[in-house]
Design a protein with these regions (language model features):
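Anion-binding alpha/beta catalytic cores of soluble intermediary-metabolism enzymes, centered on
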Residues: 1-186, 191-247
Length: 247
């Protein structure tokens, strides 16, 4: 595995001696085992930061073809069956990219939709969230979401996606019909894309704590093979749930 790492990083000037030291790090070794085809995925992070987990994954496994932005999705298992898929919502990005540009936000939307379909089995209905609904407010951050919607439609023409939508317009049929008449997503969204990491992290934790929802994740997206990151405050239940998702 040291030889493989040396080959992968030779353009960066890595020597075999440096590679031999790095493979003693389980995070590097795990990614090398995956890269070599000897394992299918990795779950880490109970004792490491997200940066520690992502660094070897991006250096060794790299991103999914066509994707340059790594992100994290959170499954929100709420007690409100009228929302999402029997109360299940998927939110992104909640873990990785602090201030995505329009291109990155579009990639986050497409990747989160794929996660919703592959992990939850839901047909994704993606709402690009904002403090504006269909031009109700004017601001450069709203313009970014509008541009991300356009790019996402180009990336995935068959994906059910719309924006910009406020959260209530995305989730509540009556509000959606009033604020965004004719929208295929308003009032029926099950995948929520937030405009920044700050919004995502705050939002899911408010839903988790005040709404007593179970938050499962983050599920890392955009890496070519399954690599997932645990919170350092994770429970045994968190670990086995993420093992199942990674598998």
């Amino acid at each position: 595995y040291a030889q493989l790492l040396c080959e992968l990083r030779k353009k960066k000037g890595m020597t075999i001696e440096e590679a031999r030291k790095l493979v003693l790090n389980p995070l590097y070794l795990g990614c090398l085992i995956i890269k070599n085809g000897d394992a299918d995925g990795q779950l880490a992070g109970a004792r490491n930061t997200t940066g520690d987990v992502l660094r070897p994954a991006l250096q060794i496994i790299k991103t999914t073809p066509g994707i340059t932005c790594v992100s994290g999705a959170m499954l929100l298992l709420t007690h409100a069956p009228e929302y999402g898929k029997n109360g299940i919502l998927v939110m992104g990005d909640v873990a990785v990219t602090p201030v995505p540009d329009a291109e990155q936000l579009a990639q986050i939307a497409v990747c989160t939709a794929r996660t919703a379909k592959s992990v939850v089995g839901m047909e994704p209905k993606v709402a690009m969230l904002s403090f504006s609904t269909k031009g109700s407010a004017k601001h450069e951050v709203v313009d970014k979401v509008i541009e991300a919607v356009r790019i996402a439609h180009e990336m995935a023409p068959d994906l059910a996606l719309d924006g910009e939508l406020q959260a209530d317009a995305a989730l509540v049929p009556e509000v959606g019909a009033s604020k965004a008449p004719g929208s295929p997503i308003a009032g029926n969204a099950n995948v929520l894309i937030v405009p920044s990491l700050e919004v995502g992290n705050i939002s899911y934790k408010l839903v988790q704590r005040l709404g007593h929802a179970d938050a499962v994740g983050p599920i890392l997206q955009g890496i070519a093979r399954p690599v997932n990151d645990l919170s350092r405050g994770c429970s045994i239940e968190d670990i086995y749930r993420m093992i199942a998702i990674t598998a």
